[in-house]
Amino acid sequence: MEPLRVLELYSGVGGMHHALRESCIPAQVVAAIDVNTVANEVYKYNFPHTQLLAKTIEGITLEEFDRLSFDMILMSPPCQPFTRIGRQGDMTDSRTNSFLHILDILPRLQKLPKYILLENVKGFEVSSTRDLLIQTIENCGFQYQEFLLSPTSLGIPNSRLRYFLIAKLQSEPLPFQAPGQVLMEFPKIESVHPQKYAMDVENKIQEKNVEPNISFDGSIQCSGKDAILFKLETAEEIHRKNQQDSDLSVKMLKDFLEDDTDVNQYLLPPKSLLRYALLLDIVQPTCRRSVCFTKGYGSYIEGTGSVLQTAEDVQVENIYKSLTNLSQEEQITKLLILKLRYFTPKEIANLLGFPPEFGFPEKITVKQRYRLLGNSLNVHVVAKLIKILYE
């Protein structure tokens, strides 16, 4: 059987390509396209024999797309126009132009691809761009299903909720198709149990607008589930984290850590410890959770990813509760006892499902590695969706 000809758009460091390999379907990437020169260096390093086009997607003509004669499109368009933190410019954001170009080209191709897989951030599912995508693929004759999935559903201790769409060129619906619904779990094709739907359920974590350099005098007063216990976490948040840590279907973080790391270069500097102590999401190697790593990890603290406590037999709570009424120097001394460090780029790649052989050229800096991985996707989640789509 001829391998599928796959077009990888917005290829980044090659997450989709790794997922395609992991899925074990007969396929070959005929071209990968990305305009990011640093990401392309990493892609070439890992896939030296794949045709990589370093150009804008808008610059590719219908004739050039036709010449590639692809059976499958894997793509992860820019997410900034749809992020919760961004301006949510949607179609008016210039970064959406390349994707609108794809939607314009798709119906005019000499040969339509049989399969499409798209990944984006949560928020894409309520965008006008998504509506245009659905309209376009429906008009072309695709059957499709949308998902909101996190790696935790595959036993990976990292929350990274993302939007996915899989589409197949055929007249009969997909066996698990739920029209108008966004599925919140992988389809159980053989099961008769109803799927979990997103419906109107918005698990919005309330954004905390917190000023850095908060004093440790315990003066914040709340009650019940909103009570601030220690750090800036409510009882409800701590309960949620404890629940995640007791979910035995999820692996421990220690399974994803490097053994021979030079920890010192990844330790949080004293200044950051003092300034952001109350905002850190601290995990231990035995935890079964970590928050989403973003492209700002290693440069910014708040909301960019978890940090690892490497000191054993030290209770975070005890350290934090002992900070009251101490001078800044004494607070730093206490916080340093925890030996908090950033996850290394390799460890984040492990959590994202990249294979052990995945690597970076030496000239790519640690900051660049964090940035590239923060923009990437979870390989295992995509691999499973490719398998489901191909079946």
Swiss-Prot record:
EC nos = 2.1.1.204
Identify the residues that bind S-adenosyl-L-methionine: V13, G14, G15, D34, I57, E58, S76, S376
One GO MF annotation is:
tRNA methyltransferase activity
Q: Which residues form the active site?
A: C79
Instruction: Determine the domain of life of the protein's source.
Output: Eukaryota
GO cellular-component terms in the record? cytoplasm; nucleoplasm; nucleus
Organs and tissues of expression:
Ubiquitous. Higher expression in testis, ovary and thymus and at much lower levels in spleen, prostate, colon, small intestine, and peripheral blood leukocytes.
GO biological process: what's one of them?
tRNA stabilization
Which catalytic reaction applies to this protein? Answer: cytidine(38) in tRNA + S-adenosyl-L-methionine = 5-methylcytidine(38) in tRNA + S-adenosyl-L-homocysteine + H(+)
- One of the Pfam families matching this protein, by short name: DNA_methylase
Q: What SUPFAM superfamilies does UniProt report for this protein, alphabetically?
A: S-adenosyl-L-methionine-dependent methyltransferases (SSF53335)
User: What function does the entry list?
Assistant: Specifically methylates cytosine 38 in the anticodon loop of tRNA(Asp). Has higher activity on tRNA(Asp) modified with queuosine at position 34.
- Family listed: Belongs to the class I-like SAM-binding methyltransferase superfamily. C5-methyltransferase family.
Recorded protein name is tRNA (cytosine(38)-C(5))-methyltransferase
